[in-house]
């Protein structure tokens, strides 16, 4: 039933203006016009590939301690370099079976990196 449908990532933030700057300027996502939906004050919808990332205003922003969204990218190391050049700071986690190569966590062929948005939501990159 849902296997052929796109999913939308939904992330809670405190300040939509701050979130918009981060997701557009740092990550390169593009704002989606919601038309006359009346949601523009509370929800920011962003295009990421063929997916959407919706950020919404919430007093619970940043309280999730797990990864909120993951981007599958062909070159994790190159994407990390590009994001660092835009001021994105990467996290370092001690995970079983994983080694570190700079900001990239490595386990066999798996390469992954984690970073946070301004509200502390955990975001990640992983190779296909």
What are these regions (language model features)?
Residues 1-2, 45, 71, 80-128:
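Vicinal oxygen chelate
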Residues 1-20, 66-69, 126-128:
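N-terminal beta-strand motif that seeds the catalytic metal site of vicinal oxygen chelate
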Residues 2, 10-13, 29, 55, ...:
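Conserved short hydrophobic patches within well-ordered secondary structure
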Residues 11-14, 61-62, 104-106:
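Alpha-helical interaction segments
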Residues 18, 76-80:
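Short, conserved charged micro-motifs
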């Amino acid at each position: 039933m849902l296997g052929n449908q796109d999913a939308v990532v939904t992330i809670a933030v405190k300040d939509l203006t701050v979130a918009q700057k981060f997701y557009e300027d740092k990550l390169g996502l593009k704002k989606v016009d919601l038309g006359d939906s009346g949601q523009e004050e509370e929800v920011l919808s962003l295009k990421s590939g063929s997916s959407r990332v919706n950020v919404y205003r919430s007093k619970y922003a940043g309280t999730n301690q797990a990864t909120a969204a993951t981007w599958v990218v062909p070159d994790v190391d190159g994407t990390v370099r590009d994001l660092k050049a835009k001021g994105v700071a990467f996290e370092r986690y001690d995970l079983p079976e994983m080694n570190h190569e700079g900001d990239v966590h490595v386990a066999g062929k798996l390469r992954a990196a984690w970073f946070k948005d301004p509200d502390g939501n955990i975001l990640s990159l992983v190779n296909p």
